[in-house]
From Swiss-Prot:
InterPro entries named in the record: Aldolase_TIM (IPR013785), Class_II_FBP_aldolase (IPR050246), FBA_II (IPR000771), TagBP_ald_KbaY/GatY (IPR011288), TagBP_aldolase_GatY (IPR023955)
Residues that coordinate or bind Zn(2+): H83, H180, H208
Function per UniProt: Catalytic subunit of the tagatose-1,6-bisphosphate aldolase GatYZ, which catalyzes the reversible aldol condensation of dihydroxyacetone phosphate (DHAP or glycerone-phosphate) with glyceraldehyde 3-phosphate (G3P) to produce tagatose 1,6-bisphosphate (TBP). Requires GatZ subunit for full activity and stability. Is involved in the catabolism of galactitol.
Active-site residues, Swiss-Prot/TrEMBL: D82 (proton donor)
Subunit structure of this chain's protein: Forms a complex with GatZ.
Reactions performed catalytically: D-tagatofuranose 1,6-bisphosphate = D-glyceraldehyde 3-phosphate + dihydroxyacetone phosphate
Pathway annotation: Carbohydrate metabolism; D-tagatose 6-phosphate degradation; D-glyceraldehyde 3-phosphate and glycerone phosphate from D-tagatose 6-phosphate: step 2/2
Designated name of the protein: D-tagatose-1,6-bisphosphate aldolase subunit GatY
NCBIfam families noted in UniProt: cbbA, PRK09195.1, PRK12737.1, tag_bisphos_ald
Keywords associated with the record: Galactitol metabolism, Lyase, Metal-binding, Zinc
Pfam families membership: F_bP_aldolase
EC number(s) from the headed UniProt entry: 4.1.2.40
């Protein structure tokens, strides 16, 4: 079985002291880059898609593509709903075969966040689907969800335990100073807060907004309990900038099979670096 749940992946990472990267993909080419690189490095990876990606590609198409590529490369892959907010949307995708979900109700007050997440957990666990939820909010924009930096807030360690116990989630996304998008300056991550959260919560912890973080910061968060690292913007930026450069230098280019190669190569460099930073090479 090559398409797997994230639950076992993250539990293995927690025991092994490494993290599994979740790469946001958008089309066939970005999927190829992630899977080919992961297979060559024998690394566990999660294929993540926002609601916009699932709409763009089509849920059934995306599921079929992940399954086909996992079999082609004899490499286990997990497909994950990233930053999904609507119960009916999640339910439809779970019934289509998705086995890993992030329900993002972090914009709601604490009690309502618990209620919304528990509803999703109760449904998903009937299908053996793992559920991630977020406590605290990251600044920046992910798909159509935007949070002003002034409105972002950090995860409360004591509330984190209550949240985990009340909802029954399988992994917890924490807010410790990262943001969606690229950073204008290096973020000041609250490592002491992360260490405190780890003392209160024994679940695999998830770090969103990792695009542009230094190797040192990523590896320090892993030492303090992060088991899943989300990367999106850095992939898009590398892919699109390389494509722009190529078409500027080769205005006569018309064959996507040719001009997309430079974009894929640039994105591949990012994927391989993140895998190395996460310490998961050879862990698949």
């Amino acid at each position: 079985m090559y398409v797997v749940s994230t639950k076992q992946m993250l539990n293995n990472a927690q025991r092994g002291g490494y993290a599994v990267p979740a790469f946001n993909i958008h089309n066939l080419e970005t999927m190829q880059v992630v899977v080919e690189t992961a297979a060559s490095m024998h690394a566990p990876v999660i294929i993540a898609g926002t609601p916009g990606t699932f709409t763009h590609v089509g849920t059934e198409n995306l599921m079929a593509l992940v399954s086909a590529m996992a079999k082609q490369y004899h490499h286990p892959l997990a497909i994950h709903l990233d930053h999904h907010t609507k119960f009916d949307d999640i339910a439809q995708k779970v019934r289509s075969g998705v086995r890993s979900v992030m329900i993002d109700a972090s914009h709601l007050p604490f009690a309502q966040n618990i209620s919304r997440v528990k509803e999703v957990v109760d449904f998903c666990h009937r299908f053996d689907v793992s559920v991630e939820a977020e406590l605290g909010q990251l600044g920046g924009q992910e798909d159509d969800v935007q949070v002003n930096e002034a409105d972002a807030f950090y995860t409360n360690p004591v509330q984190a335990r209550e949240f985990a116990e009340a909802t029954g989630i399988d992994s917890l996304a924490v807010a410790i100073g990262t943001a969606h998008g690229m950073y204008a300056r290096a973020p000041a991550l609250d490592f002491s807060r992360l260490e405190n959260i780890r003392q209160w919560v024994n679940l695999p912890l998830v770090l969103h907004g990792a695009s542009g973080l230094s190797t040192k910061d990523i590896q320090q968060t892993i030492k303090l309990g992060i088991c899943k690292i989300n990367v999106a913007t850095e992939l898009k930026n590398a892919f699109s900038q390389a494509l722009k450069n190529y078409l500027t230098e080769h205005p006569e280019a018309t064959d996507p099979r040719d001009y997309l190669q430079s974009a894929k190569s640039a994105m591949r460099d990012v994927v391989s670096k993140v895998i190395a930073d996460c310490g998961c090479e050879g862990r698949a």
